[in-house]
Curated annotation (Swiss-Prot):
GO terms of molecular function: rRNA binding; structural constituent of ribosome
Role: Protein S19 forms a complex with S13 that binds strongly to the 16S ribosomal RNA.
Keywords for this protein: Ribonucleoprotein, Ribosomal protein, RNA-binding, rRNA-binding
Entry's Gene Ontology BP terms: ribosomal small subunit assembly; translation
Species of provenance: Microcystis aeruginosa (strain NIES-843 / IAM M-2473)
Protein name stated in the entry: Small ribosomal subunit protein uS19
HAMAP family reported for this sequence: Ribosomal_uS19 (MF_00531)
Coiled coil: none
One Pfam assignment: Ribosomal_S19
Top-rank lineage group of the source organism: Bacteria
Annotated family: Belongs to the universal ribosomal protein uS19 family.
GO cellular component: cytoplasm; small ribosomal subunit
């Protein structure tokens, strides 16, 4: 079940303030954020937002196709290093 249309999309207040400030200035600089739950809105298009993945900030360039998704979707928190290899020599007798 999605969020109510009456409420509108969730965007962290501090992140929204930074976006509005940069849009007013017309500058494009990297914005660091820990708010992975914030929804990408049209005002964010063209900005680079560094989203925290638990270890570091991953730079995410926001395009029009990303509008409506969450910031956390574009900064994976887990790294897949492959399945464990089986030791076939130990099984022989």
């Amino acid at each position: 079940m999605g969020r109510s249309l009456k409420k509108g999309p969730f965007v962290a207040g501090h992140l929204m303030e930074k976006i509005e400030k940069l849009n007013a200035q017309g500058s494009k600089q990297v914005i660091k954020t820990w708010s992975r739950a914030s929804t990408i809105i049209p005002d964010m298009v063209g900005h680079t937002i560094a989203v925290h993945n638990g270890k570091q900030h991953v730079p995410v360039y926001v395009s029009e196709q990303m509008v409506g998704h969450k910031l956390g979707e574009f900064a994976p928190t887990r790294t897949f290093r492959g399945h464990a290899k089986s030791d076939k020599k130990a099984g022989r007798k």
